[in-house]
C-alpha cells in the first residue's frame, strides 16, 4: 500500500443541478422511497454524486492526508480489536480517504486485510486477501485489486461513501455493488462507511434495495 511498494500490475448523464426533492417527493426524509419515484431520485442522485466527487477532488493532497489520518484514528476506536479478524478495505479512488497505511497496521496487529473485487457487473463483490507485496492488477474502473488470493468472508467491511445521511444510508457510485453484496452474504459483517464530513447530505432518498451502514466514520 505505501508508494514505495513494488506492485506488479496487469492490465487485463441527465446532468442537471440537484432538484428540490421535497417538491418532487413531498414526504421526503429517511423513509424508503417507493420504486415508482425512482425516475425522480435517479437523476437527482447522479447530479449529487457529481457535486460531491468534484468537491472532494478539489481538496489538495495535504488536506486529504490530514483528513484520512483523522478517519484512521476514529476507525481504531470504532472497530476495536482486529487480531484474528478479516477487515475488508479498499484501494482509494477519485479522492477517497486513503487508508492504506491504516490497513497495514491492521495486519501488524494480527488482523487480515481483504480487498473487494468486481467479478462481473451485476454480481456481488468477491473479497480477496491482500498483504504488502502481493501482486495487484487493474480491475474495473482501473482500480487496483489482488490478482489472485483466497476469497474470504470479512468480519468488518469498510465501504467508502460518496455521500451519506443521518440514517447511515450510503450514496455510492451507482453500481449497487455493496448493497448487492451485503444482501447476498450468509452472515452480515460489521459495516463501516467512511468519508469526509462535508459529504453529509439530508437524505439519499433510500430505495428498498439500499442497505444502511452500521456506522459512518468521518474526519470530524
Which ranges hold each PLM region?
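N-terminal active-site beta-alpha-beta segment that forms phosphate/nucleotide-binding
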Residues: 2-152
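Conserved phosphate- and dinucleotide-binding cores of soluble alpha/beta proteins
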Residues: 4-5, 9-14, 35, 123-220
